[in-house]
Amino acid sequence: MKQLLFLVRIFCAWLALFFVGKLIFFAYNGFPAGGDFLQIVWHGLPLDLSVAAYTTAPIWLATWIGHFWKTATSEKLGRWFYRIYTSTLLTIFLMIIIIDTIIYKSWGFKLDAVALSYLDNPSSIPESLGWGFVILAFLLFVGIVAGVSWLFWKLPYSSQNKTLGHSVTAHGACCHSHCCGGNFWLQRLCLSLLWAVLGGLLFLSIRGGVGRSTANVGMVYYSTVQYHNHSAVNPVFSFFYSLLKEQDYSKQAQYFAPEEADKVFNSLQYNTKSVLLPEDSLLTTQRPNVLLILMESCGGRVVGCTEGNHQTTPHLDSLAASGVFFSQCYANSFRTDRGTICTFSGYPSFPDASVMKMPAKSRVLPSIAGALKSVGYDTEFLYGGDKNFTNMNSYFLATGYNRVLGDADFPAKLRHTSPWGVCDGEMMKILRKNIDASEKQGKPWFKTLLTLSSHEPWDVPYARLNDKMLNAFAYLDHSLGQFIASFRQTPAWKNTLIIILPDHGVTWPADINEFDIRKYHIPLIWTGGAVRNSRVIAKLCNQTDVAATLLGQMGIDHSQFTFSRDVLSQTYTYPLAIHTWPEGYTFIDSTGTTIFDLNSQSVSKVTPDPKGDRLKKVKAFMQKAYRHMDALK
């Protein structure tokens, strides 16, 4: 089994390299406490394993092929392949590790594709650092690469076999005599089965495990201290992951000269200050506890108070009638990762990009949690599923949440009560317990619950409606109703604001699509003891406006939220809503609706707009949004 041991050695060698890289990173940027160091290494291990598996996989494949092609030439080719391959990767990896270590102290985040934007003028490097320093650094780097490469080249050697190719031959003979009794084809079958198992293990390591989410930067985030999270991230993984996600978004949606686009965008009156009259106040206090429930897919088509089936959501309908109901709110996007950013950061959605999947950009966004944390709130996010899905974990920890809880943080017996994790009913019970615990701390709190049961395959522990899909939404409504009824009996109710809305709309009935604005018409409800009185707000708005509207009511500055508006402010004089999906943009204002089809580059559906004003406005908005997103660093 010499070849097996060789693969284990090479795999462990990559892990050792990444461990040493962490030590170098700490030596330059500061060592954490002993306990924190072990936590960083442990939580960062999945990405280290992933990169080690990526780099070992080609060698695994080459050795497998070597079992079937054993000649003197193949031995020589095997040796050269291994040496060139490892030396090339070591050069790249060591360069990434060293640069990441050095720039972190100045940049405060991991090396990613953003760094490439600073190489437009490489001649400036020696000019700024000096040729002497550059030459010395280059020679030192070459020496390090040569030394580490030599160590890696020694891995195939053993006391009995001197080369990778020779080891293949020896292993074949060993397997031939001991495992297969001289039968050539049985020998090959044994080897193939063994290597298939090894390949499966490498695949699982590359993937990041057997969970629903694949390996991503956010899966190693575990702390409210960003230095600990950044230290856990494998710099090689971070760099190539961001490289795959990187696009030049500044070139997207280029419809106008920048000055004209800015002029049109400014006419839309985004990011205005809150100017509230006494009658504009919705709350009994400026510092309520805040609970935001983001409902999976629960769009207006299935909610009675908007335009849906009144049999499906009686509890939501009742809350809308007794609380504050924003009756003309529209979702910005079509997916959870995008709708989440829209809601919590007041940031627009894009047809071809998920900002949440780009940690280098999502981590610098403003957020409701960050704003409330800055004025003394304790912040917590709860989700019954995999919190690493689409980089949610890194986004929430980076933007102000003290704790981000996912399925692994809840009792094992509850983790499969839904196909996606912990069902909504059980999560509502956990939420109640966490609220009770926060109440004992004596400080204001902001909690967020993202539900999951109202999602395909629509399997829920509830049976009231025959339509399986509608029954899943009825279960969400039932769970929410039980939670509200229970929470209403506690002293905490009086000082709590509860905001309820979905992450995006829903395709129901099945023939509805993005070209029908009813699909993304969503309910937005404010309830709780901190709500002054019931009210219907019929102003056109987006879910991106939740952030500025909430902070405006609380007297907290929201000037960082460039694309969010306070719907209750006297400055909100041009109500409009925008929605995007991969094939187009929708723009809605008091004059009607314009839907721009990106495939045909033409207006697909429109109410009268003789001058094309709405089309011009949505194009200018998207041009501004892309330019802003491209600049996020």
Task: State what each model feature region is.
Residues 3, 36, 76, 124, ...:
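Exposed alpha-helical structural elements
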Residues 44, 48, 128, 154-155, ...:
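Residues that form generic nucleotide/phosphate-binding pockets
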Residues 209-562, 571-575, 581-582:
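Soluble catalytic regions of membrane-associated enzymes that act on cell-envelope
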Residues 63-65, 473, 587:
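Short alpha-helical linear motifs
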Residues 2-248:
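Transmembrane and membrane-interface helices of multi-pass
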Residues 174, 215, 530-633:
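Membrane-interface soluble catalytic domains
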